């Protein structure tokens, strides 16, 4: 057995890492939010739940840097939910005029309201909500319940982090199978993760993984990076304060992300970036990211691509080759993203593209998701739901179904268009076909009209199905009305 601990870095190479040593508690590192008091009623009495701080950024205040910061709160707790759970939130700053508990589609309204508090019921742990007083979305409160985890893993392959603070630094996992990192309720793990060639890797629990002490400057890295990690599973944890992308997953098959929570404030704090992955299931997540919530990308390192992008000195003209060099497959296919709640303070909530490098994208389905916020509407990157047809890629069989978009502060509900954003050599996408929008409900007044735009006769979109796309309850029935623009390079459009 080999265990090396040096300079704040944990190397895990087919070894058993002993349970982490806890120092203090999570409150030492993630200070208490002083704006809110949260209590739950159980056992005949009110029990106070600790409220943590998290930073978020206001795109309207600083759209380029994204560093106009605010402090929101989040409360994590577990309950059996054998019966509905009553929650009381007190606004310590004083009185308020109105309160919203979102998603509004949950139908949660206060049972009791005083000048500075509200009480309401949660029917099950899937009802994770944002409590917003007087329309304040920057300094709001997330209530994040879960069921207790009764299946805590044990064994030589388990790295266990118990309640308290764990200064893990960089956790590197390589060339092994079956490793489990378990963050128990009350655990706060400080650091980031790099994993490569680690099959059947699981990261789960009810704790918090926080990267607040990692470099957020020029050398910032993703919070968790996975390369060639087949059958990866991430479940139950909350990821806070990523320096860059939150989850960067490259060249991995059979990925399952379930019930994760994310709060990120910095530019590029994408929630999940999938690069050359296939057979992916994302479900039951609750995400607030400054940048994209979920984005699906590709780069290229096929022998043909490498040969055509190698300079005379042996270097690559496309530096992204290094990210995906040595992968077995590059096709992007078989994605299902379902039952998630998405909040993007700047960018997209559900994005396919634009990075493609000539790779084929197919069989991608987003369904039964809720959008709480979206803002960007700059002519290049709009769309709570978007397909950016770029970078010599091909895109087919992409569906968005049963999506609720609440009263977002700006942006568009949907966009599919040709672009050369983030493309190598300025290439647009080749073509797109079979795009479906079904049961899309937007309620609000601030979103601008959606787009579906081909580029020319050759670079076109062929086969668009639109069924029950409504704006404030009114069906969208054509592509020339006030809510949807479809241009002449989009063919075979069907309104159901």
Regions found by a protein language model. Name each.
Residues 19-24:
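Boundary at the C-terminal end of the N-terminal hydrophobic targeting segment
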